[in-house]
């Protein structure tokens, strides 16, 4: 997520297009890798501590990638709030393994609209 997310941000023309690109990437990943999301949640404690530390570092960097764009878009946001917004958006998008009610094309559009709306950039 971090590598491609960084590429998307680097290719974007400003924070709002960067956030839209991040949303699109995360939605795409979540729809294509539902099982991975479930396994990570379920088997987290089975990972050795060193692996958990590495994953947490990558996750923090990914959150901060989003938070930086949110703060560029709205300089009044403090870092803690921007991180909380990113986490809340991830929760929305990562709910896909538990929602098989819509075909992927409709789910993609729904998640995109909801995620962008939650970030205030709809």
Residue ranges of predicted features:
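Amphipathic alpha-helical linker/stalk segments
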Residues: 1-20
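Short, structured motif recognition centered on aromatic/hydrophobic residues
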Residues: 1-2, 20-23, 40, 89, ...
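Amphipathic alpha-helical packing segments from all-alpha helical-bundle domains
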Residues: 2, 49-74, 83-87, 109
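Solvent-exposed, charged/polar functional surfaces in cytosolic regulatory/catalytic domains
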Residues: 3-8, 25, 29, 61, ...
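Short amphipathic alpha-helical interaction patches enriched in hydrophobic/aromatic residues
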Residues: 5, 9, 48, 74, ...
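Residue-level recognition of alpha-helical structural elements
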Residues: 15, 19, 51, 78-82, ...
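Amphipathic C-terminal alpha-helical segment
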Residues: 29-32, 36, 68, 79, ...
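Amphipathic alpha-helical segments used for helix-helix packing
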Residues: 30-50
């Amino acid at each position: 997520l971090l590598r491609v997310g960084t590429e998307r941000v680097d290719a974007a023309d400003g924070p709002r297009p960067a956030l839209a690109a991040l949303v699109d990437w995360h939605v795409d990943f979540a729809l294509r890798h539902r099982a991975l999301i479930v396994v990570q949640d379920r088997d987290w404690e089975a990972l050795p501590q060193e692996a958990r530390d590495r994953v947490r570092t990558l996750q923090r960097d990914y959150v901060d990638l989003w938070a930086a764009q949110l703060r560029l878009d709205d300089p009044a946001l403090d870092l803690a709030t921007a991180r909380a917004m990113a986490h809340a958006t991830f929760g929305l998008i990562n709910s896909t393994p538990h929602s098989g009610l819509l075909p992927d094309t409709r789910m993609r559009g729904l998640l995109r609209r909801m995620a962008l709306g939650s970030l205030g950039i709809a």
